[in-house]
Amino acid sequence: MRVALVHDWLNQSGGAEDVLAALARIFPAAPIYTSIYAPERVSAAFRERDVRVSWADRLPGIHRQQQRYLLAFPFAFRGFDLSGYDLILSNKSGFCHGVRKPSGVKHICYCLTPTRYVWDLQGYLERERFHPALPALMRPLMGWLQRWDRRAADGIDHFVAISSAVQRRIARFYGRDSVIIHPPVDTDRFRPSEQKGDYFLVVSRLIPYKRIDLAVQACTRLNLPLIVAGDGRDRARLEALAGPMVQFVGRVPEADLPDLMARCRAFIFPGREDFGIAPVQAMASGRPVTAFAAGGALDYVQA
């Protein structure tokens, strides 16, 4: 069976890219189609794959600020020629599900989420801390993007949701049924440890919608030790909010992460996420998880 993998953008490392890497291992001969690709910013494993990019990859500055080119992505994915395949498997949180499906080809969408800034523009812009005037400027475009997104969803043969929360959003925004398959999580290397530290832990990309500020402010006010592992464009703002008990350690090497997880007092997961891989790894390490009571975390964290 000839399979094409389709992914929104390969310019960052996170849970979506972990899912793509797992799909690539399942289908080792499948090329990866994506809008943009910055090999230096993602796992080296992708450099061994056949990654095919769209014309959008040549736009200036897009590797670091793809949000500026929001309207380019629907057209970028429509430009791919996927004839010659038996199956298209899209790993979607943005616009990649909008690829053209040739006659006779099946399209399965592994839906990380219906596109946030298409269906929840106000909330997305508030979480990302854009200029307050931007919603009014973008609102006329949202009607077009929502119609485009719905038409793209109509062309998909089968939807797979990563959590119950995403399944409900697929039904609400696309009017489609879906099955739930939780994302693959590497838990084999995470084990409980008899050595315990006295710190709380956050492991995340430091971007506004992850709401790491809630954990930073809570631990600062309560004078509790917190280690924040990860990096991103929100780091400077978070450091300005932090008290002396909050330590930012940057991106932690994968080899060091299991020990950091196993020794924490508890793992904090403050955002409204679609699923959440790091909390599952923390539980595999035998550590309790404190999560915001919404989103995908409700599938695996119980009070």
Residue ranges: model-predicted function:
Residues 236-258:
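Nucleotide-activated donor-binding/catalytic signature segment of Leloir-type glycosyltransferases, i.e.
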Residues 262-274, 287-288:
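Acidic donor-binding loop of glycosyltransferase active sites
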Residues 276-280, 297:
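Short glycine/serine-rich donor-binding loops of glycosyltransferases
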Residues 288-291, 301:
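Short hydrophobic beta-strand element within catalytic cores of glycosyltransferases
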Residues 127-159, 167-168:
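Membrane-proximal helix-turn-helix segments that form the acceptor-binding/catalytic region
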Residues 26-97:
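Active-site donor-binding segments of glycosyltransferases and PAPS-dependent sulfotransferases
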Residues 191-227:
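Conserved donor-binding/catalytic core segment of Leloir-type glycosyltransferases
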Residues 168, 172-173, 184-198:
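Acidic anion/phosphate-binding donor-loop and adjacent secondary structure
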